[in-house]
Amino acid sequence: LVVTAQKSGGVLTLTGQLSPPDSDLTALYRGLCLGLRDYVQKNGFPGVVLGLSGGIDSALVAAIAVDALGADAVHAVMMPSAYTSQKSLDDATKLASLLGIRLDTVPITPAMTALEKMLSDQFAGTNPGVAEENLQSRLRGLILMGISNKHGPMVLATGNKSEYAAGYSTLYGDMCGGYAPLKDIWKVDV
């Protein structure tokens, strides 16, 4: 409701009109921001930390976090591997700059090399595949949980409902987090 007040001769006249309702996606976005803000504040977290990959899901979660909590309360971490494209790195860096959030880079290649060496006997005689891919995701979750445990921000998972419903995610990896803002949002709405 938009109201204009005029006072004339001791009489206050109010006139106004109702603003049009939000579009469905605008209302959904506002609801996602409200849900995250309420959860973080009611549970006493000083802020949030999330992995920023350069993809659309993590970009949307970062934007929701900034609108819900303010840029100072959002810490993004890029965790590149040998397979991370320069475009993904550039996109994540540009987004963090546009949102005004802290962005740190923690390369996972040294940890992957160490894990592959540690597991070489167990993985001997097999072709690289899903197990190795999942190690990368789990390393990223471990890094975010370490930051959370040390400094207190809650980890945000960046998966969406389509990924969770189809099982297209890694337990203890990209599902890692205290809150998943997109958990009830189908990929088509992301």
Question: Which residues fall in each region the model found?
Answer:
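RNA-binding accessory domains that recognize and position tRNA/RNA substrates
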Residues: L1-V49, V66-D67
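ATP-dependent adenylation/pyrophosphate-handling site
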Residues: P46-L52, I56-T93
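A conserved beta-strand->alpha-helix junction
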Residues: V2-V11, A73-M78, Q86-A131, S137
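Conserved helix-loop functional segments at active or binding sites
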Residues: R37-P46, D67, A71-V74, A114-D121, ...
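Residue-level signal for inorganic ion chemistry
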Residues: G55, A96, L156
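Alpha-helix capping and helix-loop boundary segments enriched in small/acidic/polar residues
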Residues: S23, L52, I56, M79-K87, ...
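Flexible loop/turn segments at secondary-structure boundaries
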Residues: I56-L60, Y83-K87, T105, A111-L115, ...
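Active-site adenylate/phosphate-handling loop in enzymes that bind or generate adenylated species
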Residues: L99, Q122-V190
